[in-house]
């Protein structure tokens, strides 16, 4: 998860939805939202081990509109949900590489790992989505459907070219995490 993307999307969606619904929305319960994303990705109740990598710059260490919100305090923490255990790791670019390069490197490592059964991606689409989409397309183009199901790319808008993996909209799980019912939308 790119923290800058999460902050922009969650903050923007919260402000938009509060205006549309005419009421104040709670901050997002981060473990609950991650559970909704995992369900969208196909995980079901069992003993899943979900590693959540929070990729950020040193200055962006707070999750806006989320609880818990301190990225550094989340580092090396875990929580259990009916889907399994979510273990958090804070990964910072520390100025050595860009967040984009770090995200793409971590994504490539996970794609190549036999230990990773499902890779859920939330990059900063507006900043480096094209790079993510090019890498995904190159990796999955010649793979079969089962192999293509390894990655779930959470999107705010449709990619301009095929990425050859599963696409899921991020908005519905976020609306659910805000406590919004489908008939309110």
Kindly give the residue locations of the regions a language model identified.
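Internal, well-ordered interaction modules that form the hydrophobic cores of assembly/scaffold domains
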Residues: 57, 98, 107-160
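Eukaryote-biased recognition of electropositive, low-complexity segments
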Residues: 89-93, 135-185
């Amino acid at each position: 998860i790119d923290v800058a993307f999460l902050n922009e999307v969650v903050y923007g969606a919260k402000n938009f939805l509060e205006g549309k619904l005419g009421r104040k929305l709670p901050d997002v319960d981060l473990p609950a939202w991650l559970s909704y994303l995992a369900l969208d990705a196909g995980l079901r109740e069992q003993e899943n081990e979900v590693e959540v990598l929070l990729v950020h710059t040193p200055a962006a260490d707070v999750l806006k509109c989320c609880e818990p919100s301190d990225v550094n305090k989340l580092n090396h923490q875990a929580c259990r949900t009916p889907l399994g255990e979510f273990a958090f790791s804070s990964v910072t670019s520390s100025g050595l590489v860009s967040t984009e390069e770090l995200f793409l490197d971590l994504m490539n490592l996970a794609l190549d790992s036999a230990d990773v059964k499902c890779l859920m991606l939330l990059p900063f689409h507006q900043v480096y989505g094209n790079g993510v989409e090019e890498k995904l397309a190159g990796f999955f183009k010649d793979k079969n459907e089962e192999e293509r199901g390894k990655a779930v790319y959470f999107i705010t808008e449709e990619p301009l070219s095929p990425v050859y993996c599963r696409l899921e909209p991020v908005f519905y799980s976020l609306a659910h995490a805000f406590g919004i019912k489908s008939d309110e939308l």
